[in-house]
Amino acid sequence: MAALHTTPDSPAAQLERAEDGSECDPDQEEEEEEEEKGEEVQEVEEEEEEIVVEEEEEGVAEVVQDAQVEAVAEVEVEADVEEEDVKEVLAEEECPALGTQERLSRGGDAKSPVLQEKGLQASRAPATPRDEDLEEEEEEEEDEDEDDLLTAGCQELVTFEDVAVYFSLEEWERLEADQRGLYQEVMQENYGILVSLGYPIPKPDLIFRLEQGEEPWVPDSPRPEEGDIVTGVYTGAWFWTDDIEDHEEEDDEDFLAEVAEEENEPPGLWSAAYGVGDVPGTWGPDDSDSAQTPEGWGPDPGGLGVLADGSEAKPFLPGREPGANLLSPWAFPAAVAPPAGRPETTCDVCGKVFPHRSRLAKHQRYHAAVKPFGCEECGKGFVYRSHLAIHQRTHTGEKPFPCPDCGKRFVYKSHLVTHRRIHTGERPYRCAFCGAGFGRRSYLVTHQRTHTGERPYPCSHCGRSFSQSSALARHQAVHTADRPHCCPDCGQAFRLRADFQRHRRGGGCAEAGGDGPRREPGETAAAAGPEDTDPGPEGSEVGEADGEAEAAAEEREEAAVAAPTPSGKVDPAPERRFLELGNGLGEGEGPSSHPLGFHFPVHPKSWLHPDSFPILGLPDFRERLPVDGRPLPAPLGGPLSLVEGTGLACDPFGGGGAAGGGGGLRAFGPAIGGLLAEPAPAALAEEESPWICSDCGKTFGRRAALAKHQRYHAGERPHRCADCGKSFVYGSHLARHRRTHTGERPFPCPECGARFARGSHLAAHVRGHTGEKPFVCGVCGAGFSRRAHLTAHGRAHTGERPYACGECGRRFGQSAALTRHQWAHAEEKPHRCPDCGKGFGHSSDFKRHRRTHTGEKPFRCADCGRGFAQRSNLAKHRRGHTGERPFPCPECGKRFSQRSVLVTHQRTHTGERPYACANCGRRFSQSSHLLTHMKTHRGATAAPGSGSAPAPAPKPEAAAKGPSSAGPGERGSALLEFAGGTSFGSEHQAAFAGPSGAYREGVL
């Protein structure tokens, strides 16, 4: 202790005398002289310290002062207040005999963390000569300050970010070389001090850059608000900043709407709904303080640094081991248990831990619903000043982030980063299930719902659930009928801002100088038709993205199937005159429990008029069918419906006639099943789609979509498979094709574990477990689990057979039937029966044939127990029990249980006799009558005792193909197929017209 007594009245000497209880020197004059000397020494020290500080500040550029002044202010206040509290407690415990004046004097010499930092810088300056007593006293006080720092460190968790300062590129370039060196040395020394003190902190990104010799500037470092420091949390694999601009949002309006919704929602709503923080970009209820992780969270499966909450993540830097520190206890400082003795830094509502009380106070504003920062323009309140600054850009129109490639400007930095991926082609977000790449994290999240079946956005009116918030917003407009976006020139109103913008820029407004339809003054805005076209996932700012929306949209279309609506009714709202197949639930039901309840995307060709569908009832319907793209006559009998897969199109608003200006229907193929017609021009004008294909007239909402579509006309297929050389128009089609080579099946069945290469195949397979048949025939009521099956079934009513054999000309209603038939022409028949030697080209035909030898009848009737060798025969037999007669005659109304019987019956009305005898020319309406008649010729031609066998009867197929198979004016009948595979009749189809409103796609 004696070695510390450099001066008679040093603090250590005073403490020793106070503990020993010794009396002061009786000589008052000497004591006063000593005090005066101490005061003089203290003044000299203060002056020297001020000189050192001034010299240091003069050596730093003005921009450095601007970047640090606000940060220093808050740290000094917080550190001074906290250190004063700690020092008072220590002084009371260790030095109870000291007076108030002495403790204040001692506390006043303590240095704040910022001053300590500056002291580190000042230590390099040449020291002013001083006497040995003053130097020893200063060393003693520095030792005491270090002890105080260690004591404070035990009370508070200090991070590198508390003392770190960041520079933007512009600020860094303005620094001189010696200033940059000084900054680098100070930052490295600060980090070394914290590590030497035993703080469990990882190596920050800034220090890692300095060690690698890289420049430590931060891209577009924002100006910190008053009282705040630009800080972040290093998670071991990424440096996660809490700048709200880094949140990836769809567009400006959506982002501000989400911020507003978040501020009005009760705490914990985000966490309960999505497993993330209350504010986008956090794991906890607040985005400004820390990053908490949910239980079991780990690195991204694809290793690409994708956080589940949407915050920007920097990729792994070269030379650093990926994921080495990801799950370390110090990787999430906010999740570490609060230090003992600091209950004031722990939120008593949610339990979050904060390094400073000021941050805790800010965080508690969320729980208290305090919004001290109000917008002067609209009066909206915000919890943080940075939120207000971002909101004010909506009033000022400021877009401070320009694209260096195309010059387009953005309000948010994250939007610029996302937009630049259009130019670079970068797709950093990969699906862990199928490997699909996306330019936005939100697209990846939406895409992954096709694998998980998640529909987190339920409608509060009808209970229907959606996988995207934008789809829910469009759906809710049906309930509210709200059209807030009104054109100032023509008065036409729109539900969506994107539709309104397309209307303004696409020339659809006649009053504004466009060539669009001009509405009458008395016409209401609601008559404009639906504006439910999907603006696309890009939103208004990245509408021309080359491949991002393509992959997401095509994946949704691939897995586009949802839980059925048992009511089978069309949406009664007159505004929604389009067909939505499998969009979840009907009216009044709860959220869908279907494991693959995907939302079917609304397509412009999915119009369905809620009234009748009389086109098939027209007597001359067959004559009006177009050939090679010729337009159909307009007045076909009223409003029609476009049924996807049948190629029938109509005016969706009942104006398809000549008076309605519909312009008629247009078809693009020789047969119904191959047609894909477009809505009438009136409907196109009301959809407000500005991009029109000059070759086929098809319209698109985005220029990029039109450019991709035109590849079909140009024959361009830029995406080629490296294995087989097959080319594709879209990259997503190539990726899907690649699965045939790799054997990848990324879609597993949750019931049986079977895996599929396409989501649509999985969805159809799942319906086999659930028994769903959402596609219902409007003629006979038959249900089907796949749309293709319904389309093929519809041809049984229309008599359409679009698939023709190139060898014999025989036509089929299904491509699979044509494929099986073509095996008959091929020499190769790999499946040969061991009993009779008959060969088959298809395994299914071989299996059916084998049942004739084995007598196997695996399909049994549940009512009578009768067995059948084929499922179709069982279905026909079941109609005998149920009394079902799904095939009505359009002439007399008589109904039949089998289509073949109906075809035979129709010949009684038409007088058709397609089966002719080759010997006498007599004609018959049924093949059985011809076979009976042939027996008379066989008995007459066989002379008794001649020994010659009777002449074999000509094959019905040959007779049917002959020129005499149909008389003049007769069109022939539909092919009559028997169970044995024999077909009778001509290749010409009978004129068959279904009843009024007979055939359309419906949904259970």
UniProtKB/Swiss-Prot annotation:
Residues modified as Phosphoserine are 10, 112
User: Mind telling me which InterPro entries this protein's record contains?
Assistant: KRAB, KRAB_dom_sf, Znf_C2H2_sf, Znf_C2H2_type
Q: Where is this cross-link: Glycyl lysine isopeptide (Lys-Gly) (interchain with G-Cter in SUMO2)?
A: 829, 955
* Chief subcellular location: nucleus
- Residue numbers carrying Phosphothreonine: 7
Q: Read off the Pfam families from this record.
A: KRAB (PF01352), zf-C2H2 (PF00096)
What are the leading ranks of the lineage? Eukaryota, Metazoa, Chordata, Craniata, Vertebrata
* Record field: compositional bias (Acidic residues): 21-60, 73-95, 132-148, 531-557
Q: Does the keyword Phosphoprotein apply?
A: yes
Protein purpose: May be involved in transcriptional regulation.
Q: What is this protein called?
A: Zinc finger protein 316
Q: Please give a single GO biological process term from the UniProt record.
A: regulation of transcription by RNA polymerase II
GO molecular-function annotation terms?
DNA-binding transcription factor activity, RNA polymerase II-specific; sequence-specific DNA binding; zinc ion binding
| Low complexity bias locations | 61-72, 939-968
